[in-house]
Amino acid sequence: MKQTLYEKLDELAKSDIYPFHMPGHKRQLQDRQFGDTLKIDITEISSFDDLHEPEGILKEEQEFAAGLYGADHTYYIVNGSTCGILTAVSAVCRWGDTIVMARNCHKSVYHAAYLQNLQIEYIEPQRYKEGYPVGPVFTKEIEHALQRAEQKQAAKAVILTSPTYEGVLSDIPAIAEIVHAHHAVLIVDEAHGAHLGFSTEFPQSAVRQGADLIVQSLHKTLPAMTQTALLHICGDRVDMQRVQYYLDIYETSSPSYVMMASMSKCLHLIGEEKDSLFSAFDEKLQDFYEIREQLKHITILDEVWAWNTYHAYMDPSKINICVAGCMRNGSIYTGKMLSAELLEKYHIETEMTAEQYVIAMTSVMDTQEGFDRLKAALREIDSKLSVIESRKSTITRSGYMGTELPPRRISDEEENTDFDCKTEKNVKNNAGRSAGQNSMLNVEEEEAEHRADSMQTAYTIREAMDHKQKAVDWRDAIGRVSAEFVIVYPPGAPLLVPGEVITQELNEKVRHYQKVGLNLQGVQDRTLQRICIVTE
């Protein structure tokens, strides 16, 4: 071993690489929090309570968290939102129940479905175009999924991700109304939204929008240590005893007091200074987004883009930097190239790399110097790019808040053809349709594409994974039932789920993602030459 983990971390801390990625503390906590963490790394000693049976200080801390967010009950979680997801699904769904699930859910949701042998009724999030951020889940799709489930076995829960990794939000108030009308529980994976609801400049949290169980990762977007998360209960549709029962199963019996202290410090900081923190954060974001008028080729997929494309709201703290249609020296310029150049030349590490865009993840702890470095880097990179002729941009004047988005809709079914939104960039794709237009106008076309892309399910996830199986070459697996996941990570959403029939179209997509350098997980053979299938 050339370096220990500590030596490597210490080396990184002393470098000038700027962290446009989680965790949210952004290495800025030295003066705000504690220095020598080992001094507070204790176990359940006298007067320090027990997270699994809180009666003292930890009970008080969780009650403070509930009050801060507006939940009825809140639980500390020290092994990530994954634990919260497993707990939420298991508490609501019993063995063999049906759950309505958004296809872009995190892999932990699929693992929960495996553990409870759940029947899954999928709903497809809206998609503008391959390679762009996935959109919201529409209420109509949820209504149809619940109705389909009722023909066989009524769904006990609906689970979806909002905001998405890229920051796109679904219409939680309208969705909650529909879910509750079908006597189901709404679970929202809000892992990327722990910072929501503390400022009018940011979208509201699902905690205050009618969801029943909400899971948040504190560490992703707020100043807290990695793995720290919260599970909120709102209303009386969920059995608290079952929630506590499954928390006792999934959460470690040795919770870290260092992590819990980090959570406490984070939440009290937000409670005391949220106005000043989020005001300063918003000013930095507004200043950053002015770069949109200066970029000729790179496009920032912001909240105006999300509204025009999906009629959905977007979290401005997620900076989506899109290079679709960009070229350099006669060759296509990809998201992978952008992220590599930002790191190698400008010492900026981004959160996620997709085929045509990268995500720079921000928080209240980001510095003006960090934003300025990113702006300078993007301006310089943009000056060296050109665009494919069919994707030339039209620039119009509009500041970050220059286009006033209307108040949150009651329902996403509301007619939107009268909404006239000026965007800074109307990015035209190869077909000539503008990303600035509402791409959901041709709903029948979109639904047909979703049906064509849908996978045929032969077994539940548990049946497939526990079945007799063997590894075969991918070309021999076409038409057979998969016993493995194929997951694009990050963000962690599966392309293929155990129990689904492997298609040639899927094989081609996997090869394409592999070619462009995306990280694919879930299969034993990391070279993706072979895959495990169910055998009779």
Question: Where are the regions that the model predicts?
Answer:
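Conserved N-terminal alpha-helix of the aminotransferase class I/II PLP-enzyme fold
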Residues: L38-G80
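Conserved C-terminal alpha-helix-loop-beta "cap" of PLP-dependent enzymes
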Residues: E290-I395, L441-V501, E508-G522
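Structural signal for conserved beta-strand scaffold positions within catalytic alpha/beta enzyme cores
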Residues: Y76, Y122-E124, Q216, M352, ...
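Terminal helix/beta-alpha structural elements that buttress the NAD(P)+-binding lobe
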Residues: Q524-E536
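Short, glycine-/Ser/Thr-/acidic-enriched flexible segments
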Residues: R27, Y165, K220-T221, D236-V238, ...
